[in-house]
């Protein structure tokens, strides 16, 4: 990454208002997919003081108790009392969901499933880098870990005065494309009014920041900004309106890679905004894991109603062991990037999506899950099971 000597990424906790909205949208998707794997779901959520509004287009044979589902998500996150300003038990729930347009539906559904067309036009990117063990850029990786730790400290009772809303930001220093230090750390966390700023600063520094970030990357000149505006009691949907799909850079690569603009949460796998972005990560990660490149970015694009991608492009930023054109050939040979094939390849028709809606969709560990009678693996796009075959066919 020689073009930058410093690079900064941010993340937000599950209690951030935009992430509340994402989690509600994905919880709705999960509940529907659990009953109807052929459903078409595009679910959008808005949260603000005293209310959650759920909208979108959904075509399904399933029935879900939307109000109960939305309340459960909000309470699970930690907004369970008027004391914190937003209470999932009592807030208003407004449902304005409609059905998917028949004009869109006729372009997606096909007699043969493998001919399923893309749910929309668009461009999607996937990325991987060898700078961390999960093959993700370090700034976004560290930013996610900070807010994950904030939530862990809050929910475990280690720091019971924490509240759900939090943001993090990490600036990494690079030399010759490798991370050599962390130059700045920002962590803003909502808290109860009785905690002093001095006690908060000490606890956050010792039990969140130093507990999470590699000590060898922190140095005497590292800047630490903990709640830099001071008091942060009012947060969540009281402080800011939250919307589904407004944290697309947090959800992906922290700005290190390009982004096609489409959000993920609330969309079933027929929407290539989501499924093709997951496939792009799967492709890029396997290319880096195979040793074909130190960094890899893939772009794919689609036309609505058309199964085959309209383009597949690769950029290894000069780190490739073989040419980028040859890598594109290998991608076409080893990965079927038609929408139905992606869904099959990554086994996406399971209620696996709510866990993706906080702390990043990428750089996660594949995990076995069971929902009802359905057992499956989540985060399948993080597997590197194609790496050996790619390396062999590349002649490395």
From Swiss-Prot:
- Which EC number(s) does the record attach to this protein? 2.5.1.6
**Flexible loop: annotated span:** 100-110
Q: Which residues bind ATP?
A: 16, 165-167, 231-232, 240, 246-247, 263, 267
Task: Report the enzyme's class at the first EC level.
Answer: transferase
Question: What's the record's note on cofactor binding?
Answer: Binds 2 divalent ions per subunit. Binds 1 potassium ion per subunit.
Query: Where do the annotations place L-methionine binding?
Result: 57, 100, 240, 271
Q: Which UniProt keywords apply?
A: ATP-binding, Cytoplasm, Magnesium, Metal-binding, Nucleotide-binding, One-carbon metabolism, Potassium, Transferase
Coiled-coil region(s) at which residues? none
Write out the residues that bind Mg(2+): 18
Specify the pathway: Amino-acid biosynthesis; S-adenosyl-L-methionine biosynthesis; S-adenosyl-L-methionine from L-methionine: step 1/1
Q: Which co-factor is required? A: Mg(2+); K(+)
Q: Identify the residues that bind K(+).
A: 44
| One MF annotation (Gene Ontology) recorded for this entry | ATP binding
InterPro entries per the record? ADOMET_SYNTHASE_CS, S-AdoMet_synt_C, S-AdoMet_synt_central, S-AdoMet_synt_N, S-AdoMet_synthetase, S-AdoMet_synthetase_sfam
Q: Where would you find this protein in the cell?
A: Cytoplasm
What does the record list as GO biological process? one-carbon metabolic process; S-adenosylmethionine biosynthetic process
The disulfides recorded in the entry are none
A GO cellular component annotation in the UniProt record: cytoplasm
How does this chain assemble? Homotetramer; dimer of dimers.
Family note: Belongs to the AdoMet synthase family.
Query: What does this gene product do?
Result: Catalyzes the formation of S-adenosylmethionine (AdoMet) from methionine and ATP. The overall synthetic reaction is composed of two sequential steps, AdoMet formation and the subsequent tripolyphosphate hydrolysis which occurs prior to release of AdoMet from the enzyme.
**UniProt name for this protein:** S-adenosylmethionine synthase
What species was this sequence derived from?
A: Azotobacter vinelandii (strain DJ / ATCC BAA-1303)
Highest lineage ranks of the organism?
Bacteria, Pseudomonadati, Pseudomonadota, Gammaproteobacteria, Pseudomonadales
């Amino acid at each position: 990454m020689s073009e930058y000597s410093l690079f900064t990424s941010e993340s937000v906790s599950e209690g951030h208002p935009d992430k509340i909205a994402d989690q509600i949208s994905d919880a709705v998707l999960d509940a529907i997919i659990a009953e109807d794997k052929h459903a078409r779901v595009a679910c959008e959520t808005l949260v603000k003081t005293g209310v959650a509004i759920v909208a979108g287009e959904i075509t399904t044979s399933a029935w879900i108790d939307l109000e109960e589902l939305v309340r459960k998500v909000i309470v699970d996150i930690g907004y369970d009392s008027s004391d914190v300003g937003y209470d999932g038990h009592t807030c208003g729930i407004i449902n304005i969901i409609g059905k998917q347009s028949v004009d869109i539906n006729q372009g997606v559904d096909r007699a043969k499933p493998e001919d399923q067309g893309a749910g929309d036009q668009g461009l999607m990117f996937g990325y991987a880098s060898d700078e961390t063990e999960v093959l993700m850029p370090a700034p976004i990786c560290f930013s996610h870990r900070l807010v994950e730790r904030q939530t862990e400290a809050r929910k475990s009772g280690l720091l019971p005065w924490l509240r759900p809303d939090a943001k993090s930001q990490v600036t990494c220093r690079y030399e010759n494309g490798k991370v050599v230090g962390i130059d700045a750390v920002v962590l803003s966390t909502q808290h109860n009014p009785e905690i002093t700023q001095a006690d908060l600063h000490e606890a956050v520094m010792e039990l969140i920041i130093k507990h999470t970030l590699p000590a060898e990357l922190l140095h005497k000149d590292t800047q630490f900004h903990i709640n830099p505006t001071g008091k942060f009691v009012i947060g969540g949907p009281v402080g800011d309106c939250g919307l589904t799909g407004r944290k697309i850079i947090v959800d992906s690569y922290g700005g290190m890679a390009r982004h096609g603009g489409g959000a993920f949460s609330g969309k079933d796998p027929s929407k290539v905004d989501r499924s093709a972005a997951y496939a792009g990560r799967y492709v890029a990660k396997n290319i880096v894991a195979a040793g074909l490149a130190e960094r890899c970015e893939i772009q794919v694009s689609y036309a609505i109603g058309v199964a085959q991608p309209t383009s597949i492009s690769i950029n290894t930023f000069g780190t490739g062991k073989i040419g980028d054109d040859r890598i594109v050939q290998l991608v076409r040979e080893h990965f079927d990037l038609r929408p139905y094939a992606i869904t099959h390849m990554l086994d996406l028709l399971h209620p696996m999506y709510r866990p993706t809606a906080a702390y990043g969709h990428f750089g996660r560990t594949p995990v076995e899950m069971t929902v009802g009678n359905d057992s499956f693996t989540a985060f399948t796009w993080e597997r590197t099971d194609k790496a050996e075959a790619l390396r062999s066919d590349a002649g490395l």
